[in-house]
Amino acid sequence: MGIATFAVVDLETTGNQLDYDEIIQIGITFVRQNQVIDTYHSMIRTDLEIPPFIQALTSIEEEMLVQAPYFNEVADDIYQLIKDCVFVAHNISFDLNFIKKAFEKCNIQFKPKRVMDTLELFKIAFPTDKSYQLSALAESHHIPLNNAHRADEDATTTAKLMIKAFEKFEQLHLDTQKQLYYLSKNLKYDLYHILFEMVRNYQTKPPNNQFEQFEQIIYRKQIDLKKPAVNFDGTLKDLYKNVTQSLNLTYRPQQLYLAEIILDQLMHSDKAMIEAPLGSGKSLAYLLAATMYNIETGRHVMISTNTKLLQSQLLEKDIPLLNDVLDFKINASLIKSKNDYISLGLISQILKDDTNNYEVSILKMQLLIWITETNTGDIQELNLKGGQKMYVDQKIETYVPVRHDIHYYNYIKRNAQNIQIGITNHAHLIHSDSENTIYQLFDDCIIDEAHRLPDYALNQVTNDLNYSDVKYQLGLIGKNENEKLLKAVDKLEQQRILEKLDIAPIDVFGLKININELHDLNEQLFTTIYNIIQTSDVYDDDIHKYHYVYDFETGEILKDLRAIIDKLNKTIEIFNGMNHKTIKSVRKQLLYLHDKFKLIEQSIKDHHTSFISIKNLAQKSTIRLLVKDYDVKDILTKQVLEKFKSLTFISGTLTFNHSFKAFQNWFNEDIDFNTFEISTPLTSSNHTNVFVPNDVETYNYKNLDDYVASIVDYIVEYITVTQSKCLVLFTSYKMMHMVQDLLNELPELEDYVILTQQQNQNYKIVQQFNNFDKSILLGTSTFFEGFDFQANGLKCVMIAKLPFMNKHNIKYWLMDSEFTSTFKDYVLPDAVTRFRQGLGRLIRHEDDKGLIVSFDDRLVNSTYKSFFAQSLEHFKQRKGNIKQFNKLLNQIQRSIDNESKS
C-alpha cells in the first residue's frame, strides 16, 4: 500500500445546513499500511442549540459540550494532523465540506491533495451488501459499533472497514487488480492511486485452485453439491425434540402439531390452508416437516416466502442452525428462473463495452469483485437499482451467447437432484416458466405468508410501455455513428470495406435515419398520451404517489403504435440475412422493442382493460401505458395450483371471519382444500387494549383540519402520560404531513423525535424509531406488515383510518372484473387482513403490552364491524372521550410500573 497515511474523519454536527450548522464532535482514525496507527477525538463546543433529533441520534447533549473547546481552539492542531494525509470519510461530501467550512472560519485553507469516499469504496469492495449505511456495514462484516453516530466510533469503524476492503483487493489476481485500476479512473475520488500502488507492488501468489479464468475474467469455481447422506431412523417428534434441545428452544406442542399437519399434507399429496398465528414458530415447523418428508421419501420440497428478507433468513440463518445440530446436512438452495442467472460471456461483454459513465464503471468493478465470490451467479445478489439495473437488463435482453460460454444456471441445474429444500419467493414462483427452470423437479410446495400471494400475482397481470424505458432502449442503439450499437455497426461496415469481409453491405445511413424517426415517433406517442391525461379525469394514489387515468379513447394511441411498429419492421428488414454477432445484437434490441409495442397494440385491439399512470403530472417522461392481459385468478391457478401435486398455504391471516373461503376464491378451480385454523397462544390480557375515541370530529376528506387536530390531541395525551414512543398510521400522505406540521409546533414534544415515512427509506426510518426511546413515527398503512415494533413497556399504534383501499386505487380497478362484489369479496377481506397483520406485529409475545387507538369508528360502528371482531378477540375494547383515554393510560402505566417493581 506504499507509505500513504489515511485520515479517516467523521463529524457530528447540529444539522446538515453548511452555512448555518456547526461541528459538535470530531473523530479521526489514522491508518498506514493497513494498520490503525493513531486516533484523535474531541467534543466541540457550539453556541447553537442541538436539536432533539440530533441529541437522540448521537446521544450528545448540550451539557456534554460545556467544557469542550470551540473549533477555532483546536483547528490548527487538527489541520497539522491531517494536512498531509489522504482525507477519507463515509459519504465524503458531507464531512469534507463541513470541515473545510470550519477551517475557513479560522482562516485556514484546507485543500487535501487526495480524497477517498468509503461509500464509493465499499460499494465496490462489498458488492452484495444490502445497505451501505455504516451501522449495516459494521453488522454485515462483524465489526463492533456500540455507539453509532458518535464520531470517534464511526471513524474507527470506517477505518476498519476500509482496511478490510484494501486487504480484499490485495488478495485479488493481478489481472483483476489491473482492470479495477483502469476502471477506477472514471470514479469521482482518488481510489485509482491506491489501486495503482497495489498493482505496482503486486507479489506473485501461489496458484489457487478455487479460481479459474474465462477470457479476461478471474472467477470462483463452482463446487458441486454432494448427495446428502441422511441417517435418521426416528419420527418427526424425535427430530423436533432433538432440534429444540440442541438449540435450547422451548418445546412447544403447538409448534410440533403444526409440523405434523404439514408433513401429513406432504405425505398424502394434499392441498391445505393453514392459519398459524404470528409467534407460533412457522419457519421451524415447516423446515422440519420438509426435512422429515425428504428423509422418508427422498423427494424435494419447495418453500416460497413473501420477501427476500425471509428468504435470506431461511438460507443464511435458520437452515445453517439446523445443520449445526443435526447428524446430517440439509442441502438447501435458492431456486429461480434461468434469466436470473448470469453467464461469464455476458460479464465479459459488459466489461468490454465502451460505456464508462460513473454508474457503469462502479458496476463493472462490482462485477469483477462479485465474480470471485459468488457461488450462484444470481445477478440479484448485487441489488442493482436505477440506471445500473436498466443497463444490465438491456445487456441481458440483447446478449448473443458466445462459444464455450459458462452459464451459472447450468451449475444449478446440474446440482438440482441433490437439493433437498428449494427456497424461492412469491414473485419468482408466480413469474417462473416451468419449462425453463428447475421448478419442475419439485412436486411439493409450502407457501409461507400466503396471504400476500395475490399481490404478487397482481404485479404480473399487466404489460406496459414506459416512456423512459423506451427512450433508454432506443438510446442504447444510438443516434449517430459515434454512439453505442450504431458505432459498432458503422465500425463493422468500415471493416467490410477495408478488409473485404464476406458479409453483405450495411445501410448505416438508412439505419441512422430510421432510429432517429423512431425517437420522434416515440415522442409523438407519449405526447398523444400526455394530451389525453390533460383532458381526462385523473385519480390520485396518494400512498404510492401516482396519478391514474382509467377512462379514455384509444384510437389515436393505436394510430401512433402502428406507426412505430411499421417503422421497426422496416428497420429490422435492413438486417435480413445477416448473421454477424454485432448485427444480431442490434436486431435483438429492435425485436425486443417491436414485441413490446406489438403486444400493447394487440391487447388494446382486443379491448383489454387499459389505463395510464403518471408519476409527475408536469413530466411526460413519467408516463406509463398499461394493459391488463391476464386475470389474477388465472395466474394463481396456472402458476401455483396446477404446478404442484402437494400445496400447503400458511399464514397468520388466511381466514376472513373464521372462513378460508375468501382466500380459496383466488383460484379458478374448485379444489377441496384441507383447512386448519390453529388458535393463537396469546390470551386476553390487561395489557392489550383497543380504544375508539367518541369525541373526534367526523371525517371529512374536503376539510381535514378538525379531524387532524383531534389526532394530535390524542398523540399529545399519550406522550404526556406514558413518555413512550408511538406509531401513527395514515392512509394518505396529505393527512400525515398535516399531523407532522402540528406536532412540530408543540413545545410539549421538544424532546421527541418526529419521524415521517419517506419513499424507499422504510428500513432506515424503522431503525431510527426502534433506537430512539422518545420518538413518534408517522407512516402510511404500508407499515402494517413487516414492521418489527421494538419498545420497552407499552407499544402503541394509532390508526387514522382503517386500511381500506380507495375505489380509484389501481388494485380496485384491476380486480373489478374478477369479483361479483369487489368491495365484499376483495376490498373488505384485504382491509381486515392488513388490520390483523398490524395487530400481529404489535403483539407477538404473551408479555407484550399493546394499545390500539382507532380514530376510525367504523371499527366498532359499521355494518361490517363483525368482520374486524376476529382481530380484536384478545383485546379489551373501550370507547370514550379524551378524559377516559387519560384514565385508561394511567391504569396501564400503573400496571406496567407495578410489574417492573415486582
Curated annotation (Swiss-Prot):
GO molecular function, one term: ATP binding
Pfam families: Helicase_C_2, RNase_T
Any single GO CC term annotated in Swiss-Prot or TrEMBL for this entry: cytosol
EC number annotated for this UniProt entry: 3.1.-.-
Record-given protein name: 3'-5' exonuclease DinG
Classification lineage: Bacteria, Bacillati, Bacillota, Bacilli, Bacillales
Family affiliation: Belongs to the helicase family. DinG subfamily. Type 2 sub-subfamily.
Gene Ontology biological-process entries: DNA replication proofreading
Role, per record: 3'-5' exonuclease.
Stretches assigned to the Exonuclease domain: 8-161
InterPro entries in the record: ATP-dep_Helicase_C, DinG, DnaQ, Exonuclease_RNaseT/DNA_pol3, Helic_SF1/SF2_ATP-bd_DinG/Rad3, P-loop_NTPase, RNaseH-like_sf, RNaseH_sf
Residues that coordinate or bind ATP: A276, P277, L278, G279, S280, G281, K282, S283
Keyword Nucleotide-binding: yes
Highest taxon of source: Bacteria
CDD domains the record matches: DEDDh
All residue ranges annotated as the Helicase ATP-binding domain in the record: 241-496
Keywords attached to this entry: ATP-binding, Exonuclease, Hydrolase, Nuclease, Nucleotide-binding
PROSITE patterns (alphabetical): HELICASE_ATP_BIND_2, HELICASE_CTER
Source organism of this protein record: Staphylococcus epidermidis (strain ATCC 35984 / DSM 28319 / BCRC 17069 / CCUG 31568 / BM 3577 / RP62A)
Entry-linked PANTHER family: DNA POLYMERASE III SUBUNIT EPSILON
Ranges where the Helicase C-terminal domain occurs: 714-883
Motif placement: DEAH box: 448-451
Coiled coil: none
